[in-house]
Amino acid sequence: MKVLMFGWEFPPKIYGGLAVASYGITKGLSLQNDVETTFCLPKPTGEEESFLNIIGMNQVPVVWRDVNYDYLKSRLPNYMTPEQYYAFRDHIYADFSYLNVNDLGCMEFAGGYPANLHDEINNFSIIAGVVARQQQFDIIHAHDWLTYPAGVHAKMVSGKPLCIHVHATDFDRSRGKVNPTVYATEKNGMDYADCIMCVSELTRQTVIREYHQDPRKCFAMHNAVYPLSQELLDIPRPEHKKEKVVTFLGRITMQKGPEYFVEAAALVLKRTRNIRFIMA
């Protein structure tokens, strides 16, 4: 099975949990003998691991440019060959000459989450139309709302099933103060999706209730964890003879629930004083 996957970040460039989750699922799929994954990123670093195929959307042309082979070879990064560039160029499907493109006819991406994020999401989906016309694949997988438009476009072009991966909803990120533009993007992706993967049952229920999705196409798939390496296991554990230590490991954001940690600490410390709470 060939998977065409759209994601917004991937190690070694990590902005948050999305990169780690994207790595985990693609690494797991790579261990299956019958699965081949092509991962589309706005702006790869060129240092991504080689267990999957990387497509840099910033190297896929959307405007025809008559570029010779030697010049291409000098301009393209290590994850794109001139042959691949020409193959994509042959699948430009509309006149995008009004867009801001470079000398190769490609759109540039800032990477990460710039001020013009919604413009970059739209550009990403335009390029997805070229990729979906050129690539051979059996299923589409889109990570989070940023790539839902790309996934929907790829489905409309290819007719292949779309699976979207809901790492979080805007209800989770905003404590209920939902951005209507983000909500519309999320809901449109869910409406077009053939299946909706949610990171928890709580997220699944939010998708069903707030986005009015059919429960039959929504399922929870929890993020996995890797066992610790022997090198880490061999590190001597510190002895806390007088204190017990409770650690909060996570970003200090509403979504991770740090206030619950503080509230729990206050309750515990009313009963005992030999516990140290650490936010790391």
Predicted regions and their residues:
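Nucleotide-sugar donor phosphate/pyrophosphate-binding loop at the beta->alpha transition
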Residues: 117-127, 160-163, 171-188, 227
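Membrane-proximal helix-turn-helix segments that form the acceptor-binding/catalytic region
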Residues: 129-134, 156, 179-196
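A short beta-strand/loop micro-motif in the catalytic core of glycosyltransferases
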Residues: 140-141, 192-201
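Nucleotide-sugar donor-binding and catalytic loop/hinge architecture
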Residues: 1, 231-245, 269-271
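A conserved catalytic-core segment of Leloir-type glycosyltransferases
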Residues: 34-135
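Active-site proximal beta-strand in glycosyltransferases
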Residues: 3, 139-141, 148, 152-172
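Conserved donor-binding/catalytic core segment of Leloir-type glycosyltransferases
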Residues: 239-256, 262-265, 278
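Carbohydrate-associated surface elements
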Residues: 202, 224
